[in-house]
Curated annotation (Swiss-Prot):
UniProt binding sites for [4Fe-4S] cluster: D36
Source taxonomy: Bacteria, Pseudomonadati, Chlorobiota, Chlorobiia, Chlorobiales
Full protein name: Light-independent protochlorophyllide reductase subunit B
Assembly and oligomerization: Protochlorophyllide reductase is composed of three subunits; BchL, BchN and BchB. Forms a heterotetramer of two BchB and two BchN subunits.
Organism: Chlorobaculum parvum (strain DSM 263 / NCIMB 8327)
Pfam families, per database record: Oxidored_nitro, PCP_red
Length: 535
């Protein structure tokens, strides 16, 4: 039944495809029923690349099951002839995992060289998207990484960048720019854009950079254990984190450089990291102290998403923009302990760990923060609640797969995040001002024609004025149903409350009315509630 609702994580099949679709010369064959070919539509809809997804389905039909036959060997053979990939990854879907078939034996029956086939028989009932992707990438690194002489010049590997990653290409560009400024070359980016030969030469780099807690850290750990390669796992989200990231890279590279007798790398001038090469690399340090951004000081923010983004964005909002964090959470339970450790001292209460968007939405409705940083799910929830929201984590929609340069990593990314915070919350304030003061003559609405209303006749035969009738009708309705009702005048007064706290004010007023025994909230009751609640 969960599939009838939004899910934060996709299936294991989705995680496998994110890795293989990122690579060159790698094709995936899914042993699955026809319906599981939805995965190709996901990439053609969201991924802004000219290539078609490198995925094929070995269709399992009910007739095949009855006969005890399998199409898998024939499908693998067809893929090998048509696409000629260097590697074919065979994986089961949730449906075919129930059959408990030996995929390795069936794949070998295709007659294709075993060295060109990799069976990744992950259990899709126990493993979801993130864990499946991390597991497959680690297995690929274990299989193909080979001892290599180190590159002559300082170099790094960038691990964990995958298809459908959050602002993938922009983040890569930002990291490449900073590394180039340091004079450090990129040996391999994997899995994004990597082929089998690239995986083989991973050990040639001096340092591994794995900024994503969800993907790449296990592979970096394997390379460290087996090839002695140091790794840097912090994500450069924000100015402070980027400076730490740069210093960590310089320190690790200089250790290896000293063994080779090379001159140490020095931290360049900060302006060298800027887009124009003349100004500060980020405007956040001074912008955060302007009158505009000072108004954000102590504004309440809630952050939800994957582990990497939640930790980085939470620290950025509090440490660099001065916002008040009222809560944070993640949909990845296996990363929860790491997130708690990283955010110790940042949260007023417990970390929210859930994969149910309804629980996150309920928290937002209860707290009504001034800003929510979340996923596409939170964007939908916040639209219903009239709460400003910016997307900072997968899952995302087309709005976060842009052709332009919008990184979240590095100095450039700090500027993008600050802009998103500012515009998300400020545009919300603009909406409130328009609600409060009107459209200032920008639009002219036609006046509604006057409608003559006959005086209402009460039960005892007396005439009631038209102004009194609605209030009496509201009382009658409320008495009959036992529910609270609001008069038109009270609703009008509520409309002058800023939209981002309006629901909370309505709820508090309802509670006050129940306490004093009122069933109809009039303008007078609304004013009393406001005084009682300290507003």
């Amino acid at each position: 039944m969960r599939l009838a609702f939004w899910l934060y994580e996709g299936t294991a099949l989705h995680g496998v495809s994110r890795v293989t679709n990122s690579m060159k010369g790698v094709h995936t064959v899914y042993h699955a029923p026809q319906g599981d070919d939805y995965i190709t539509a996901t990439y053609t809809m969201l991924e802004r690349t000219p290539e078609f997804p490198k995925l094929s389905i070995s269709v399992v039909r009910g007739q095949d099951l009855a006969r005890g036959t399998s199409r898998l060997p024939g499908t693998v053979e067809q893929v090998a002839k048509h696409y000629n990939p260097e590697l074919i990854v065979v994986a089961p879907s949730c449906s075919t995992a129930l059959l408990q078939e030996d995929l390795g034996q069936m794949a070998r029956a295709s007659g294709i060289d075993e060295n060109k086939i990799m069976v990744y028989a992950v259990n899709p009932f126990r493993v979801a998207e993130t864990e499946a992707a991390e597991g497959l990438f680690t297995e690929l690194v274990k299989r193909f990484a080979a001892e290599q002489p180190k590159t002559e010049k300082p170099s790094v590997n960038l691990l964990g960048f995958t298809s459908l990653g959050f602002h993938l290409r922009s983040n890569l560009t930002s990291l490449r720019r900073m590394l180039k400024t340091l004079g450090i070359e990129v040996n391999v980016v994997a899995p994004w854009g990597a082929g089998i030969d690239d995986l083989k030469k991973l050990p040639a780099a001096w340092v591994n950079i794995a900024p994503f807690r969800e993907l790449g850290c296990q592979a970096a750990g394997y390379l460290k254990e087996n090839f002695g390669m140091p790794s840097i796992t912090e994500a450069p989200l924000g100015v402070n984190a980027t400076l730490r990231w740069l210093r960590a890279i310089i320190a690790e590279v200089n250790k290896i450089g000293a063994e080779k007798g090379m001159a140490p790398i020095e931290m360049p001038e900060m302006r060298d990291f800027s887009l124009d090469g003349q100004s500060a690399p980020s405007g956040v340090p001074w912008f955060a102290r302007t009158a505009d951004m000072e108004s954000f000081s102590n504004k309440r923010a809630f952050v939800f998403g994957d582990a990497t983004q939640v930790v980085g964005v939470t620290k950025f909002l509090k440490d660099e923009l001065g916002m008040k964090i009222i809560g944070a959470g993640t949909y990845l339970p296996k990363q929860a302990d790491w997130v708690r450790e990283q955010l110790e001292g940042y949260l007023p209460g417990e970390l929210m760990v859930t994969d149910k968007f309804q629980e996150v939405s309920a928290f937002i409705e209860e707290e009504m923060p001034e800003l929510v940083c979340g996923t596409q799910m939170e964007r939908h929830s916040c639209r219903k609640l009239d709460v400003p929201c910016m997307v900072i984590s997968t899952p995302t929609h087309i709005e976060n797969h842009l052709l332009g340069y919008y990184p979240f990593f590095g100095f450039d990314g700090a500027d993008v995040m600050a802009d998103r915070v500012y515009t998300s919350a400020k545009l919300g304030l603009e909406k409130h001002l328009i609600d409060f003061f009107g459209d200032a003559g920008l639009e002219y609405e036609e006046e509604e024609p006057e409608v003559f209303t006959e005086p209402a006749m009460s039960g005892n035969g007396t005439v009631t004025s038209s102004a009194e009738a609605p209030a009496e009708a509201a009382v009658a309705t409320a008495t009959a149903t036992g529910e609270l009702s609001w008069t038109a005048e009270a609703e009008k007064m509520l409309g002058k409350v800023p939209f981002f706290v309006r629901k909370k004010v309505r709820k508090n007023t309802d509670n006050y009315a129940r306490e004093i025994g009122e069933q109809v909230i009039t303008a007078d009751v609304f004013r009393k509630a406001k005084e009682h609640l300290g507003g």
